[in-house]
Regions:
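Conserved N-terminal structural module of periplasmic/extracytoplasmic solute-binding proteins
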Residues: 4-107, 124-126, 176, 296, ...
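Extracytoplasmic/periplasmic substrate-recognition and gating elements
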Residues: 58, 83, 252-254, 293-359
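Short helix-initiation/N-cap motifs at beta->coil->alpha
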Residues: 69-76, 180-185, 259-274
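Hinge/lid segment of periplasmic solute-binding proteins
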Residues: 97-159
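Short, solvent-exposed loop/beta-turn-alpha elements that line the ligand-binding surface or hinge
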Residues: 112-132, 218-241, 293-296, 309-316, ...
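Extracytoplasmic/periplasmic solute-binding protein
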Residues: 141-155, 160, 184-232, 269, ...
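Glycine-centered hinge/linker elements that transmit conformational signals in sensory
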Residues: 190, 228-261
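C-terminal capping/gating helix-and-loop segments adjacent to ligand/active sites or protein-protein/ligand interfaces
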Residues: 359-364, 377-436
Length: 440
């Protein structure tokens, strides 16, 4: 799934926070309440949303559910939102280039959904909170203001790590590296056989890589300091070590990486893994479905590993991507929107989503996972692996500052030689400091 397409960022101004609506809602001529759902059509496909909406409509004949699906959702809904025409529910990953969810968070233009957690799931006897896996709410991904209020409901969760071909490793007799020293030794071995150590679909996919590496190098507190723009955090030895490890890894990247790291060609970087031209790439469970029809080397078998540890026996982190559902403050049917969001956690809805490998963070779902992706989720059972959920804290908007872009996208310039690691570190420190000041 192209979570980070290279598209022009949509300028969503602070005026959005002023375009608030009432929960009375729109009604059709026949008296039906209109509920507008906008969902991003990513690697999981579109059919699951159509099926879930149809199932909801069957139980709510008094609601006219209008579903909008798009691979460029921000481009389509943002102009209407700036004109005061809001969808009632949006299902859209955070961390995308257009940064729509993040902009609305900064502008305080999202509806508080804390009460949804205590709603009874439509058609069932239990609450949403009781169905959700422990720890999946209450982090910066769901509670962006670092308080007890939830604004973004966790929709799908997926482990992300270094995806590789288990069959190739078995064929070559290679071991998955446990430390970075082992990783670079393997890189030299693979290079001698004409195989690159590393690639990425687009630079945006390095989010899961960096978050895990930051925690690995500096520990939980250092990771939190980076995410909350602690004073001088990018000047620390730990920060420099993160950038040095990354720069060395990028020196082993496939030569085609940067050229294909865009919205049109990103699957070609993914294909290099299936063709045994590259060993590792950062990705998530959705890649299995996204590349299901792609040709592959004989004996290919999907597998995932956490990042290598800095030292032998060190803790290893698995960045967990949580995609979100949210309600704009300007939505016209907030009550109906919250009911629909609660329905998304029903056994009926979760079953439909799971068939497309869109796994929701509800208790007991691991037992129902398709065999092809079950090993990815089994990584959570490894006692040496820690799940990492969250991301950069929200602040007031700062013109010209995009710390995710500075951290992730600069990888392209490191590979091409257009920037140095010193320039990278300086730019990150400058961006972090500006966001620290904005967060005061």
């Amino acid at each position: 799934m192209l979570r980070k397409p290279i598209v022009l960022a949509v300028a969503v101004t602070t005026a959005l926070s002023l375009l608030t609506g009432c929960s009375g809602g729109d009604e059709n001529a026949d008296g039906k309440k209109t509920l507008k759902i906008a969902a991003f059509e990513g690697g999981y496909g579109r059919d699951m949303y159509v099926q879930v909406v149809d199932a909801y409509k069957a139980k709510h004949p008094d609601v006219d559910v209008q579903l909008q699906l798009s691979k460029t959702l921000e481009d389509e809904i943002s102009p209407n939102m700036k004109a005061g025409k809001f969808p009632d529910v949006v299902v859209l990953p955070q961390g995308r280039k257009a940064a729509l969810a993040e902009t609305l968070v900064k502008d305080k233009a999202l509806e508080n959904l804390t009460d949804v957690l205590d709603m009874t799931v439509p058609g069932e006897q239990t609450t949403v909170r009781a169905k959700l896996a422990d720890g999946i709410v209450g982090n910066l991904s769901t509670n962006p203001y670092n308080d007890d209020k939830t604004y973004l409901m966790p929709m799908y969760y997926a482990p992300t790590g270094l995806v590789y071909n288990k069959g190739l490793f078995a064929q070559k007799g290679w071991q998955v590296p446990a430390t970075w020293d082992d990783m670079f030794k393997l890189g030299d071995t693979a290079k001698a056989e004409g195989i690159a150590l590393f690639t990425y679909p687009t630079a945006g996919y390095l989010d899961s890589f960096f978050f895990a590496l930051l925690a690995d190098v500096g520990g939980d507190q250092f990771y939190k300091d980076v995410m909350t723009y602690s004073d001088g955090v990018w000047k620390t030895p730990q920060a420099r070590q993160v950038l040095d490890i990354t720069t060395k890894l990028l020196s082993y990247a496939a030569k085609t990486t940067v050229g294909y790291a865009n919205e049109q060609d990103f699957t070609k970087n993914q294909q290099s893994l299936l063709d045994n031209k590259t060993l590792f790439m950062p990705n998530g469970t959705w890649v299995v479905g996204e590349m299901k029809d792609a040709p592959r080397a004989s004996g290919f078998e999907w597998a995932m590993a956490p990042l290598p540890a800095v030292s032998a026996g060190g803790k290893r982190y698995l960045t967990t991507i949580v995609e979100s559902a949210w309600v704009p403050s300007g939505a016209q049917n907030k009550d109906a929107a919250k009911d629909f969001v609660a329905y998304l956690y029903s056994d009926e809805a979760t079953g439909i989503f799971a068939k497309s490998n869109a796994i929701q963070p509800v208790k007991g779902i691991a037992k129902t996972l398709p065999a092809e992706i079950a090993p990815f989720y089994q990584l959570y059972e490894d006692p040496t692996v820690t799940a990492l959920v969250g991301g950069f804290a929200s602040t007031a908007p700062v013109e010209g500052v995009n710390i995710k872009g500075t951290l992730f996208d600069t990888a392209n310039s490191i590979i091409s030689g257009d920037k140095t690691v010193d320039q990278w570190q300086t730019a990150l420190n400058d961006a972090s400091e500006k966001l620290r000041q904005a967060g005061k």
